[in-house]
């Protein structure tokens, strides 16, 4: 990023291979001048000329780390977010009826996309039929019922999610080279979304099955992308409408990712259906949880980003 002949010249960094680097040039007073510029995981330095140019044109510079968390903000008014958008977040969350309507619509869209994933990526079975029926009922209830609180919305979501992942049970995973890289017997088929590495209480985190590890990683990649985009768009990532969170947690990003989850599921299901894995693709940790190898993680990130991978 530098000033050349009175213009701001920005050149993309290298994030993956192969990649064509793009150049951007902005003129003072340009109608297309962005209100904020976001850099992600950058190194190097900025000249005082660049800082002065940004300040003069009222452009906010936001520096994020690779996770999408803020590192620094350079803003003329000391505030990086868009006041109008943040006010909408605050007012929608504070208004009980508006918050419920937001949540019902969000979860309704999530279940509708889940229905498509069930129909297109899960083989016909009794459990698939049950999940499809529950999804249709859930969509109808969310569109037509009046809810007293968020717990009623979450109850519908939970019932549909339970049936949704139950329909995945029995999905086969293909393996190669198991003599050289043996895998646990429990990895031959998919049994459920909960992790055995979490003890008595079933939870989705700390995956103990490869499919769940793939899902968790894909969700994390998407969460990072959504957080960066939300910040670039001027929202406060910590101010959730449906979700609440501890200070600093990206509650609004947890809102945004809800309808994206079943889309991610579809991508992972399609990948699992056509890919033959090796035991070397996963690392088993001391507590029984499994993690993706760096090479597989790179491949999954490319799938989520819609980038073709070289074989």
Spans of features found by a protein language model:
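Short, exposed beta-strand "edge-strand" segments with a Pro/Gly-rich flavor and a Y/T-containing core
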Residues: 20-27, 43-46, 54, 145-147, ...
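N- or domain-start disorder-to-order transition segments that initiate the globular core
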Residues: 1-31
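Short, charged N-terminal helix-start/capping segments
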Residues: 32-41, 187-193
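Active-site helix-to-loop segments that bind/position phosphate- or nucleotide-bearing substrates
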Residues: 1-13, 56, 81-311
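A surface-exposed, charged beta-strand/loop segment in the N-terminal or early-internal portion
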Residues: 24-27, 34-37, 42-116
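Generic structural signal for well-ordered secondary structure
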Residues: 31, 43-47, 249, 260-261
């Amino acid at each position: 990023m530098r000033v050349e002949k009175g213009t701001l010249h920005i050149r993309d960094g290298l994030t993956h291979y192969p990649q064509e680097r793009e150049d951007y040039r902005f003129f003072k007073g340009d109608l297309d001048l962005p209100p904020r510029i976001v850099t992600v995981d950058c190194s190097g330095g900025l000249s005082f000329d660049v800082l002065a140019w940004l300040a003069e044109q009222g452009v906010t510079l936001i520096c994020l780390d690779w996770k999408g968390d803020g590192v620094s903000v350079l803003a003329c008014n000391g505030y990086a977010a868009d006041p109008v958008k943040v006010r909408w977040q605050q007012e929608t969350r504070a208004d009980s009826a508006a918050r419920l309507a937001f949540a019902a619509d969000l979860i309704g869209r999530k279940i509708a996309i889940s229905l498509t994933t069930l129909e297109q990526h899960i083989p016909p079975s009794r459990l698939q039929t049950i999940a499809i029926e529950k999804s249709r009922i859930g969509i109808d209830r969310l569109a037509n019922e009046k809810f007293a609180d968020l717990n009623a919305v979450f109850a519908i979501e939970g019932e549909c999610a339970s049936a949704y992942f139950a329909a995945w049970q029995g999905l086969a995973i293909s393996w190669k080279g198991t003599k050289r890289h043996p895998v646990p017997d429990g990895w031959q088929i998919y049994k459920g979304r909960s992790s055995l590495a979490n003890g008595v209480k079933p939870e989705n985190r700390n995956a103990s099955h490869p499919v769940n590890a793939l899902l968790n990683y894909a969700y994390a990649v998407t969460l990072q992308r959504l957080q960066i985009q939300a910040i670039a768009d001027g929202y406060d990532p910590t101010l959730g409408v449906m979700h609440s969170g501890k200070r600093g947690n990206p509650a609004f990003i947890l809102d945004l990712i809800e309808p994206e989850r079943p889309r991610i599921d579809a991508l992972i299901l399609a990948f699992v259906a056509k890919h033959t894995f090796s035991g070397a693709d996963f690392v088993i940790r001391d507590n029984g949880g499994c993690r993706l190898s760096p090479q597989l993680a790179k491949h999954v990130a490319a799938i989520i980003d819609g980038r073709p991978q070289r074989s």
